[in-house]
């Protein structure tokens, strides 16, 4: 192993602090709002979130010290993750510049999700919670929550969106191996789930419904709710991705001109792209969503509910509406109606550009990446790669350096190619 390669994977690459984008936004982040006169969703957060997570959600501090115990856990689960030059992809595309990718699929659970799951489970443990609960789409977040809970000897209850529960049975196996209880959502475990099922016994589920069920369960069982995405604390914890990428690129004597990431709620994208913002005002940034969930092109930038039941506060974001039921698409992690307020604000200001790609483009991108670089990537990550491939073909003679965040591997998502 070369010294350069060893340096790129040294534990010294892991940052000492999380980065919070709030102080560097072009305008103050609009605060969350209560939507009911007889019930405070904002006060509810005090009951379901670990106090330290809630503090990080509303802080204006640019940096937050990462506890040593969390850094130790980061090392245990595979951080820092590799940053690799995609030379074969460059050759295949006849691209005149360089293409790099950050591979979050190298973590223990195969995606970026574990970065914030470990932090939130650590804070829940410190509060002597009975356990943790959350929703999951494709199962990556559920797997990360299950592992993080296991590492801190906490119980975990996962509400998995029904369509993904049926499409991705091996994700259930992973969560069960980590001693988690997993049910399809909507479920009979909660009053809200039972209400949805009474109206439509075959409801495919949505992330918004899963959130509502998990919050209800947390209140009833003295569990802490684990925030998968959208909320600023989750994006802050994910900033290890971007900060590692910056250090690794510097070690290679490189710096990207263009960044690419996929967006469900925005956590992997924000964690990857946001740390670059204060460093370079000219860097181009592309956020890719599924064409079937066109939140940035057809959604409104407005105050809207984060969950279907309206238990959580409303936030200002790009949204297709909290009652939007996405098609049963191949990328369960992108079936969310909204996007993180910080990301939405930056897109509204034009600082970050958005793109939408089709299922065919995503499948072609996954196949191309597999046959050039060898990695079978997650369908969600395939969206970012599809946009990067499109960009490289349209700008092949500009010799720009491209950096893609590959948020996870796709080894448990192969059913999309079995049709």
UniProtKB/Swiss-Prot annotation:
GO terms for molecular function: L-serine hydro-lyase (adding indole, L-tryptophan-forming) activity; pyridoxal phosphate binding; tryptophan synthase activity. The keyword Lyase applies. InterPro entries: Trp_synth_b-like (IPR006316), Trp_synth_beta (IPR006654), Trp_synth_beta/beta-like (IPR023026), TrpB-like_PALP (IPR001926), TrpB-like_PALP_sf (IPR036052). Its cofactor is pyridoxal 5'-phosphate. Signal peptide: none annotated. The modification N6-(pyridoxal phosphate)lysine is found at residue 113. Keywords: Amino-acid biosynthesis, Aromatic amino acid biosynthesis, Lyase, Pyridoxal phosphate, Tryptophan biosynthesis. Its EC number is 4.2.1.20. It catalyses: (1S,2R)-1-C-(indol-3-yl)glycerol 3-phosphate + L-serine = D-glyceraldehyde 3-phosphate + L-tryptophan + H2O. Pathway: Amino-acid biosynthesis; L-tryptophan biosynthesis; L-tryptophan from chorismate: step 5/5. It holds the Pfam family PALP. CDD domains: Trp-synth_B. GO terms for cellular component: cytoplasm. It is an enzyme of class 4 (lyase). Tetramer of two alpha and two beta chains. The beta subunit is responsible for the synthesis of L-tryptophan from indole and L-serine. Belongs to the TrpB family. This is Tryptophan synthase beta chain. The gene is trpB.
